[in-house]
From Swiss-Prot:
Recorded coiled-coil stretches: 368-414
Native source organism of the sequence: Homo sapiens (Human)
Name of this protein: Small ribosomal subunit protein mS27
Span of the signal peptide: none
Similarity-based family: Belongs to the mitochondrion-specific ribosomal protein mS27 family.
Alphabetical list of PANTHER family matching this protein: MITOCHONDRIAL 28S RIBOSOMAL PROTEIN S27 (PTHR21393), SMALL RIBOSOMAL SUBUNIT PROTEIN MS27 (PTHR21393:SF0)
Amino acid sequence: MAASIVRRGMLLARQVVLPQLSPAGKRYLLSSAYVDSHKWEAREKEHYCLADLASLMDKTFERKLPVSSLTISRLIDNISSREEIDHAEYYLYKFRHSPNCWYLRNWTIHTWIRQCLKYDAQDKALYTLVNKVQYGIFPDNFTFNLLMDSFIKKENYKDALSVVFEVMMQEAFEVPSTQLLSLYVLFHCLAKKTDFSWEEERNFGASLLLPGLKQKNSVGFSSQLYGYALLGKVELQQGLRAVYHNMPLIWKPGYLDRALQVMEKVAASPEDIKLCREALDVLGAVLKALTSADGASEEQSQNDEDNQGSEKLVEQLDIEETEQSKLPQYLERFKALHSKLQALGKIESEGLLSLTTQLVKEKLSTCEAEDIATYEQNLQQWHLDLVQLIQREQQQREQAKQEYQAQKAAKASA
């Protein structure tokens, strides 16, 4: 019953107007300059036969020797077809489970995602990203954005959402462009889907909260509120551990209280910041559903206590007040704060997807310029690091050759 009330509340909250699509029927967020691959393609790279590199890696693994990061880098760099993507995936896995697994280079990860996009293998890119522990794929924000945008262009929001969840799990919301793209994907999915498992609610909640904390505007504060509401629901229904286990979230109880604190902060703010009615409706639906469910459970608990005697009741009186017992207070605070926000004109009626789309149009171009500049610096630094590795490899080979010749000469003289 409680779950159905929440779903109805969230469905009403999502009656928003979807943003207009491009004339071609597809949504384009990142500019052509951002996704352009010419600078990446024009970089200096070594040309090798993929079969020779694969054979070298196989022999090295068989001899139980470490494979160098240069070898796996060259293999990924020389992919030239969709079929070779599948072969390279195997060697990425093998390298991840080798002694040198910690030395998978950032440019190798970026190149892997680029190659997957180039040869229409986004599914492989996503698979290795989701299974990051097995493949070592921990991209930077620029690379995350490229993959996310590729799914948005195909209107594949399910996989775009999976990328957002991975950004959240890897705590990679430092860059504003990633925050904006992620929020756009999240609200696009929330506008269409009405039924969630508690795991999905937790993932949505965390993915809304973390970038929302970094956006100091109406979208950011509304995202915080929405995220706290979903996480608070999970906390009350599944327990606090379900919220923070294997998640980048704190293990301190009180997520619904934090949602109310967001309302208080916006109400007290002198800035022109509003909370979206959509997010407020979700929090209201969660509080009402949980409060009604709590009342029913209290009646059942009272019957159980009458049957079991007073000893258990005395023990319960010694237990610290729980979040469950605070629900009526939370609901009253919510109603009072909602009225205050309404009186102050701080409730935004426009939907979150529409607001986020406007924010993307306003801010993304500036964010792109910063990202592209950083990417170009990374390309230069990656090239310098690669040159150093190649020089070091040549020195080691020369040293090994000299040692071998010395040993051979010593044996001949003996």
